[in-house]
Amino acid sequence: PKAPYRCPPGPYERASLVASYFKRSKPKSKVIVLDANAEVVSKKGLFTKAWEELYKDTLEYRPNSELTEVNAATRTGKFQFEDVQAGVLNVIPPQRAGSIAANAGLITANKRWCEVDFLTFESRVAPNVHILGDAILAAPAMPKSAFMANNHAKVAADAVIALLTGKSVNDHPILANTCYSYVSDRLAIHVASVHKFDAEKKTFLAVPGAGGVSAARNEVEADYAWGWAKNIWADTLR
């Protein structure tokens, strides 16, 4: 779907891994990525280079392809200028904050997202209600990633403790994001960024020169990706 949506590189990673499987086991099959966006929205150069060099005959990317309707019976996706029938459709619909947020009247931006005070992640319309992760209207250049949501939670928890104990809320929080994506079963890439609260603009802004993307896909990044995944799962779920 058109950005913003959850896990910006997710659809491209998924397509890459399906193409990797097809190349090994079903060489007559093909992946067609129909993207509502004008271009790849995350790790563009790394993904497009992988597709060109690894899956030139296996994966086709079509930008500006906004889905309007799905016929599940015929496995057909209807787009503005064409209908596409496939053996398997993997549809990712437009996204918004969940029904609990909608029912509570917390969605205030574009009928999709919840606006918050970024120092506390408190709702702009419901005092003492704190919202984080994919549900919020993100700050500039802030991805809707699980790693970022984990950082949101830490800032929010720290703020809630301060508010409950009568202490001052941290007025200069810093968030970090790291995301790895596999482009084959043994090759991966990453993107990283740092976001600092700007008191004047009352939002988080990306720190220039902090973070970046992989120089190239490689097996070392694939090993790092697995370690990164285990660490974020442990930090979030245990």
What are these regions (language model features)?
Residues 191-238:
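C-terminal auxiliary extensions adjacent to catalytic cores
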Residues 1-25:
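Glycine-rich dinucleotide-binding loop and its adjacent helix/turn
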Residues 1, 36-38, 134:
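Cofactor-binding loop segments of dinucleotide-utilizing enzymes, especially the Rossmann-like FAD-
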Residues 11-15, 48, 149-150:
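Amphipathic alpha-helical segments in well-structured domains
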Residues 112-130, 183-204:
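FAD-binding beta-loop-beta segment adjacent to the flavin cofactor pocket
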Residues 135-177, 181-183, 192:
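A conserved FAD-binding loop/helix module that cradles the flavin
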Residues 19-115:
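A Rossmann-like FAD-binding core segment of flavoenzymes
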Residues 84-150, 162:
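FAD-site-proximal beta/loop scaffold in flavoenzymes
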